C-alpha cells in the first residue's frame, strides 16, 4: 500500500495487541502463496529490516484507511514497512516486502524465477521461458473464478468427503516460523535461523 495504515492509533497498530504490522496483515498471504507455489520448502535462515516511519507522524497524509477512525497520537508500535529475505533448502530464496505506508506506487507482485522459466502472477498470469532457440512469453487465457467461492467450495468438499485440506496446519506453522524469524532478524539487525 502506498498510504493506508488500518486502524491507525488503535489496537491494530499496537504490537502488544496485534502482534505485528503489514507483515502479519498482508505480507503473510503473499508469503503463504509463494510457499505453496514452491511446494513449501524447508526454511533455513531469514534476514529482515523493519521501518516505522509514517504512522507516528502528526503530518501523516493518507489515501484511505479502513477500520476505526484514525486516532493521531494513539499507539503505533508496529512497522509500516518490512523488507525480508529467506533462504530455503534446495537453493530456493525469497525476497518480500510488506507495507502499509511508503512513498511508492501501490503494487502487489508475485514472481517465481526458475532456471527453466519464470512466472509473473499478479495482476495476470504470465510465463517466460525458452522453447528451442527462442524466448517465449505466454499469457494463458484462464477461466475467471472467485477465490473466495473456490475456498468455500473446497472447505465444504473436505467436510463432506473427509478430504485433507489443501492448506494444512503444518504449513501454517511453517509460515508463522518464517514470520517470527523475520521479526527477530529485524530486531537483532542480523540474519537468523528459522
Residue ranges, per PLM feature:
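Predominantly a Rossmann-like dinucleotide-binding segment in NAD(P)-dependent oxidoreductases
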Residues: 1-75, 189
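Active-site rim elements
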Residues: 19-22, 71-72, 139-143, 161-169
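Residue-level signal for the nucleotide or nucleotide-sugar donor/cofactor binding architecture
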Residues: 25, 150, 167
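A general structural signal for well-ordered alpha-helical segments in protein cores
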Residues: 30-31, 149-153, 179-180
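Conserved glycosyltransferase catalytic-site signature
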Residues: 31, 78-82, 176
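Phosphate/oxyanion-binding loops and surfaces in catalytic or ligand/nucleic-acid-binding neighborhoods
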Residues: 37-41, 118-122, 182-185
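NAD(P)-dinucleotide binding in Rossmann-like oxidoreductases
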Residues: 57, 71-151
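C-terminal helix-rich "cap/oligomerization" subdomain common to oxidoreductases
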Residues: 89, 133, 155-194
